[in-house]
Amino acid sequence: MLEEKLLKKIKTINENFINLGFDLEEDFIELVTQREDIRDRIENTKYKKMTFSKDEEANSYILNLEDCQISFDIIEGEDEEGPWFEVECNIIFF
């Protein structure tokens, strides 16, 4: 279970992604649950130092921290059941 303070920060971060066009809260929670190093970076990076962007061409939503970039790549399609999407997360450390 994630701490309330971290969940609040994730909700605030997700508001930026929603403003860019996509709700990534569940995917973000899954990421910080699976990757302790990313959770620590999120907890220890001040919100003001985070930047957010969208790569329209790649359909990616990007969070830049001080020493890494997290991109959520959205793959969309349609089948006999209707439209679907998948989210793939990529992390680049600098």
Which functions belong to the PLM regions below?
Residues 1-38:
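N-terminal trafficking/processing presequences and adjacent post-cleavage segments
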Residues 25-93:
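Acidic, low-complexity, intrinsically disordered interaction modules
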